[in-house]
């Protein structure tokens, strides 16, 4: 390079660009005094905190600054909490081969085209988004050279690669038109798919070597992990209802991973001496949220059975409020009364998704094999009535159903599953009607998950309840198909009777309760499941009558059931739900 004066306006460059020019040209170019001063000032700004331990400065354990290969020695850690994140990620590692995407094809072919279109767009964004993240996180290995940081980032890189392959497997299995698939995956470059393009563009801009703020890049990564995927996870995990098991299981794993990624970068942000101001962090969170809201509006068409736009939008905003809480800044979104906005989606109630257990399989998606326990004091959102309902329902199940809750069972699991089952019932307006799958089998599948092995499945076996040292027998059926036909007959009778009610008369509520009670009592008589019939019936009854309560007096509850069997009178049973 010739020793000529550099021809550019240094005042228009970012500090990062100035520092690069300094390192590249300082010994090869002739600088004017003014140019040298600008470069020198920029360099001082960038290196102001370079002696901080987080950026590789000397510590009591490391007498010298961190060198290029010092991460070969992982101990002692300067920040043990960051090392713990890496250890946790290692212990949670999994492989794409654990997810059989093709097993969902039969269900995929049964859902509506609107639902398929919604899922395709979400999967396409995830495939691109995870690729982008994997490509960009190397930046943080340079910015945070500590061994514990590099260790986590190494694991995250592998982790994101697994995510990328899983989403590609989903797309390959579920989208047979490969030309359309190519267009979908390239949507981030097409203005026609503006919300997807805007998300990818924003992420590419904020997490970039051209960004002159190390702190803003970390906030951008926080937004990526905790906000930019919020609507997508809420959509895909809702498809547990039609039993797309591979789709749900894979996204439970991935959401768990992204939660850990978020917590790592949130902790990194907390430790940074040059952390952006709370106001600037809030600005970036708001930018990311508004882009995610556009995506939520775009990706969910009308007529998608399991998702509504208004609930999804509220969830995205509430999710950002929780991110604010975990970053120790003020919430951003409020309702019309000035209260902090909370998520209406209980199944997405916490960023701590490591607490979740998969809905379908015996394999847990939490990080280790320690006994699963939920901190209900920190449940998000704190729906007090729902938790009270679950407390009462867990209690009545224990005293009425006996062996359904053994002493060895973790009751917190039961309580969480009851909350999830209630949210499932509440998340779609069936207009008072009952559906074999949605209302009955799904509720039992969720409520009894990890309590019995055949949750959600009818059992035509020998069933009885022990009451006062005596056995109460239930009908037996030669085959499950005959049993299912009997239950379907009850459902058809209920739907017919409910539809015939005059909704305009004053006594409609009383008539509705009477019809619902008769259906529930007849269902209890048939006893279609091997266990958990009472729990399931009480959840459905509370939903049908619109009152979140459950009976808690064992003797009176049982008497009301037998009173109906002897007299056909439902009033005593109804009274159990109106105390």
From Swiss-Prot:
The reaction(s) catalysed by this protein are: a 2'-deoxyribonucleoside 5'-diphosphate + [thioredoxin]-disulfide + H2O = a ribonucleoside 5'-diphosphate + [thioredoxin]-dithiol
Q: Which cysteines are joined by disulfide bonds?
A: none
The cofactor required is: Fe cation
Task: Report the EC code(s) recorded for this entry.
Answer: 1.17.4.1
Q: Indicate whether Metal-binding appears among the record's keywords.
A: yes
GO BP annotation list: deoxyribonucleotide biosynthetic process
* Cofactor stoichiometry and binding remark: Binds 2 iron ions per subunit.
Key words of the record: Deoxyribonucleotide synthesis, Iron, Metal-binding, Oxidoreductase
Q: GO: which molecular function terms?
A: metal ion binding; ribonucleoside-diphosphate reductase activity, thioredoxin disulfide as acceptor
List residues binding Fe cation 1. Answer: 130, 160, 163
The active site of this protein is located at 167
- Specify the Fido domain's residue ranges: 435-579
The protein's matches in PROSITE patterns, at most eight in alphabetical order, are given as: FIDO (PS51459)
| Origin superkingdom | Viruses
- Protein family per UniProt: Belongs to the ribonucleoside diphosphate reductase small chain family.
Job of this protein: Ribonucleoside-diphosphate reductase holoenzyme provides the precursors necessary for viral DNA synthesis. Allows virus growth in non-dividing cells. Catalyzes the biosynthesis of deoxyribonucleotides from the corresponding ribonucleotides.
Q: How does it assemble?
A: Heterotetramer composed of a homodimer of the large subunit (R1) and a homodimer of the small subunit (R2). Larger multisubunit protein complex are also active, composed of (R1)n(R2)n.
What protein am I looking at?
Answer: Ribonucleoside-diphosphate reductase small chain
Please report the organism this UniProt entry assigns to the protein.
Ostreid herpesvirus 1 (isolate France)
């Amino acid at each position: 390079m010739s020793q000529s004066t550099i021809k550019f306006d240094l005042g228009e460059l970012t500090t990062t660009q100035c520092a690069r020019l300094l390192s590249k040209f300082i010994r090869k170019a002739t600088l004017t005094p003014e140019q040298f001063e600008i470069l020198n000032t920029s360099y001082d700004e960038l290196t102001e905190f370079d002696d901080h331990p987080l950026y590789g400065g000397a510590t009591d354990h490391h007498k010298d600054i961190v060198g290029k290969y010092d991460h070969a020695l992982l101990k002692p850690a300067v920040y043990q909490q960051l090392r713990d994140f890496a250890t946790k990620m290692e212990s949670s590692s999994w492989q794409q081969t654990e997810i059989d995407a093709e097993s969902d094809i039969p269900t995929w072919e049964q859902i509506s085209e609107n639902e398929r279109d919604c899922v395709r767009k979400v999967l396409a964004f995830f495939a691109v988004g995870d690729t982008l993240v994997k490509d960009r996180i190397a930046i943080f290995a340079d910015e945070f050279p500590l061994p514990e940081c590099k260790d986590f980032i190494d694991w995250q890189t592998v982790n994101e690669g697994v995510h990328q392959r899983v989403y590609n497997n989903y797309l390959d299995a579920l989208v047979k038109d490969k030309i359309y698939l190519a267009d979908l995956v390239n949507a981030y470059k097409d203005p026609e798919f503006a919300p997807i393009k805007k998300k990818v563009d924003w992420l590419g801009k904020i997490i970039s070597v051209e960004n002159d703020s190390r702190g803003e890049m970390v906030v951008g990564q926080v937004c990526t992990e905790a906000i930019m995927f919020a609507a997508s996870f809420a959509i895909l995990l809702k498809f547990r209802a039609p039993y797309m098991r591979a789709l749900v299981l894979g996204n439970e794993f991935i959401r768990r991973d992204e939660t850990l990624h978020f917590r790592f970068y949130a902790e990194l942000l907390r430790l940074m001496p040059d952390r952006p101001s709370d106001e600037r962090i809030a600005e970036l969170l708001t930018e990311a949220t508004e882009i995610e809201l556009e995506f939520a509006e775009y990706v969910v068409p009308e007529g998608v059975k399991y998702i509504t736009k208004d609930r999804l939008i509220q969830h995205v905003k509430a999710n950002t409020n929780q991110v604010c809480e975990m970053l120790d800044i003020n919430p951003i979104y409020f309702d019309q009364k000035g209260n902090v906005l909370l998520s209406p989606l209980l199944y997405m109630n916490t960023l701590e998704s490591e607490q979740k257990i998969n809905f379908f399989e015996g394999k847990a998606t939490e990080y280790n094999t320690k006994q699963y326990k939920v901190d209900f004091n920190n449940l998000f959102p704190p729906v007090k009535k729902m938790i009270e309902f679950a407390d009462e329902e867990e209690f009545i199940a224990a005293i009425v159903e006996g062996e359904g809750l053994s002493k060895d069972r973790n009751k917190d699991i039961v309580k969480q599953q009851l909350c999830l089952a209630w949210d499932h019932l509440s998340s779609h307006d069936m207009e008072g009607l009952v559906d074999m799958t949605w209302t009955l089998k799904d509720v039992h599948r969720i409520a009894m998950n990890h309590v019995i092995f055949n949750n959600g499945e009818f059992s035509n076996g020998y069933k009885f309840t022990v009451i006062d040292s005596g056995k109460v027998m239930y009908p037996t059926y030669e085959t499950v198909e005959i049993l299912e036909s009997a239950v379907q007959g009850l459902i058809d009778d209920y739907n017919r009777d409910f539809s015939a009610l005059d909704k305009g008369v004053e006594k409609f509520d009383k008539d509705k309760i009477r019809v619902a009670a008769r259906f529930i009592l007849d269902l209890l008589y048939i006893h279609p499941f091997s266990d958990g019939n009472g729990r399931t019936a009480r959840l459905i009854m509370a939903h049908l009558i619109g009152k979140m309560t459950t009976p808690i007096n064992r003797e009176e509850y049982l008497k009301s059931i037998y009173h109906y069997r002897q007299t056909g009178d439902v009033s005593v049973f109804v009274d159990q739900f109106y105390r």
